[in-house]
Amino acid sequence: MLFVWSKLKHIWRMENRKMILITGAGPNGVTGHLIKDKLSTKYDILTPSSKELDLTNDEEVDFFFRGKSINYIIHCATFRSNHNISHFVDEELESNIRMYFNLAKHAHEVEKMIYFGSGAEYDKSKPIIEVSEENVGLHIPYNKYGLGKYVMNTDCRRSQNIYNLRLFGTINKYEHPNKNIISNICLKLANNIDVTLKRDCRFSFVDINDVITIMEYVMANDLNHHDYNIVSDDSYLISEIAEKLIVISGKQSRLLFEQSGCNLEYSASNNRIKAEMQNFKFTDINYSLYDVFNYIDMNKDMYDIKSVDSRWNVHSNGQYPLGGGKINLYYIAAA
């Protein structure tokens, strides 16, 4: 009898689970895929690929929503100019705005829509220093990506149930070294080569697992605002992050920069989200860095160290300098 009752409760829970549409949860969508894995035991999850659902095509999106009882939209998909050239439109700014508004059009059908904004909304052509949400709009973003996110945030603030979780730097062990500077540093250390970077910079970071915890809070609770900076309590220089990782790795790699000084700061205040979640504690950055390094160290053979792009790396005549070469490097630290 106890077994039957337990089985009935399980069936009831399964039948009454809420449904989430997560965009950008395909094999290349690191954040969306991680959210899917974290929430799949609690919710029914819909994760159409870009081939199954072109979010830039309003007719396809309208058709997708027909007959579905979706409770939440988690919008993680981001269009970059080198992605999916078969889209209904193929220009970065227009594509990102179309994706957002094609989903926002259906926000009245769901409890909440959540998407991930960017610190680029504050305009990365200028220093962004401990900015609060009230600073959005003081400068209109110069680049297309930031402008698109700025337009979305303007609409989000006027909405009834759309929320912007604004990210700056994320710490995520699944991020590819081509796309994330912390993963980039970890891969170099795992391969016992010098950490060579272009220039130092101060960032605000957050552990991706904290982002998911905050997202779940937003789903379940009434909020006072519609956009929040999601960053941990302290900002860090890239050199400070690298030095922590050198200690964690136990390697004898050097930390080298091509240029002295610092690039434009990219940091934010988290006072608004902390006022909402007064008992929440952000993950200690040392724990987060340890987790990323261990994962990349164990999986370093998945990556081609020579193919790591030039976004943060020092290059000489198109060659990747494995810890040296005839380059005018600015040496700042050693293990």
Regions from the language model: what does each represent?
Residues T56, E91-M99, H139, N143, ...:
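Glycine-rich NAD(P)-binding loop of the Rossmann-fold in SDR/ketoreductase-type enzymes
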Residues I193-A335:
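C-terminal substrate-binding subdomain of Rossmann-fold SDR/epimerase-dehydratase oxidoreductases
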Residues Y142, Y150, T154-F203, I208-I212, ...:
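NAD(P)-dependent short-chain dehydrogenase/reductase
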Residues D44-V61:
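Adenosine-cofactor binding site in Rossmann-like domains, unifying the SAM/SAH pocket
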Residues F101-K144:
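Conserved Rossmann-fold NAD(P)-dependent oxidoreductase catalytic core, especially the SDR/UDP-sugar
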Residues T23, P48, I73-C76, M113-G119, ...:
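SDR active-site strand-loop-helix element
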Residues I20-K38:
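N-terminal Rossmann NAD(P)H-binding glycine-rich loop of SDR-like oxidoreductase domains
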Residues E59-S95:
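NAD(P)H-binding glycine-rich loop region in Rossmannoid oxidoreductase-like domains
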